[in-house]
Design a protein with these regions (language model features):
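Structural signature of nuclease core domains in nucleic-acid processing machines
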Residues: 1-142
Length: 142
């Protein structure tokens, strides 16, 4: 449960300013997308034609901000960790799949992936090279 003191920094943050400035704000946006199995499970890449077959990705994005020329995906986290590296290592693969799924649905590119940590009371940008399709897991040693 979040208390008011945990919410104050959020409403003073750049994240909140971007939410207010977006042309469209999609909240709790469900999606289901068929992707090549090698993108869904990187370990399957290169393992015959099964790795090229479809794998379903289903989820709910906390917030998708749509601007005139780009989109951003925002994921809220209530984990207790106060270490940005923890969030990047734990959630880059998830946001990589979200980015891929929404790239197929939106008329503009997804150019920013952000986690807002209520424990840290701060936003953490996921470097796009970590979230590149099929690259993030290699960078993280997975």
């Amino acid at each position: 449960m979040l208390d008011l003191e945990q919410l104050r920094p959020f409403f003073a943050s750049g994240v909140w300013q971007r939410i207010a400035a977006a042309r469209q704000v999609l909240r709790e946006e469900p999606f289901i997308t068929a992707l090549p199995a090698g993108e869904v499970v990187p370990e399957a890449a290169g393992r015959g034609k099964g790795a090229k077959g479809p794998g379903l990705v289903q989820g709910i994005a906390d917030v998708v901000l749509v601007f005139d020329d780009h989109a951003e995906i925002l994921d809220y986290k209530t984990d207790k960790s106060r270490n940005a590296t923890y969030y990047i290592e734990s959630y880059a693969a998830q946001l990589r799949l979200y980015r891929r799924a929404f790239a197929l649905r939106l008329p503009v590119p997804v150019t920013k992936l952000t986690i807002y940590s209520f424990a840290m009371q701060d936003e953490i940008d996921i470097p796009l090279e970590y979230a590149a399709f099929g690259i993030g897991d290699k960078l993280l040693g997975r």
